[in-house]
């Protein structure tokens, strides 16, 4: 899931992704936007 959160590193995406997927969240930063996935 790509969310509308700007990022320069995956660490910036982890908290917003955890809000969606909980403790099983994975986060990537792609093209300046956060991508969340379930692990």
UniProtKB/Swiss-Prot annotation:
Disulfide bonds: 7-29, 13-34, 17-36
Natural source organism: Centruroides elegans
Site note Aromatic residue of the functional dyad, residues: 37
Pfam families: Toxin_2
Organs and tissues of expression: Expressed by the venom gland.
One Gene Ontology cellular component annotation held by this UniProt entry: extracellular region
Protein name: Potassium channel toxin alpha-KTx 2.11
Cited function: Blocks Kv1.3/KCNA3 voltage-gated potassium channels of human T-lymphocytes (Kd=0.98 nM).
Location of Isoleucine amide modifications: 39
Alphabetic keyword roster: Amidation, Disulfide bond, Ion channel impairing toxin, Neurotoxin, Potassium channel impairing toxin, Secreted, Toxin, Voltage-gated potassium channel impairing toxin
Miscellaneous comment in the UniProt entry for this protein: Negative results: does not inhibit calcium-activated potassium channels (KCa3.1/KCNN4) of human T-lymphocytes. Does not inhibit voltage-gated Shaker potassium channels. Does not inhibit Kv2.1/KCNB1 potassium channels.
UniProt-annotated site: Basic residue of the functional dyad, residues: 28
Lineage: superkingdom: Eukaryota
Family: Belongs to the short scorpion toxin superfamily. Potassium channel inhibitor family. Alpha-KTx 02 subfamily.
Chief localization: secreted
MF (Gene Ontology): ion channel inhibitor activity; potassium channel regulator activity; toxin activity
Domain comment quoted from the record: Has the structural arrangement of an alpha-helix connected to a beta-sheet by disulfide bonds (CSalpha/beta).
Subcellular location: Secreted
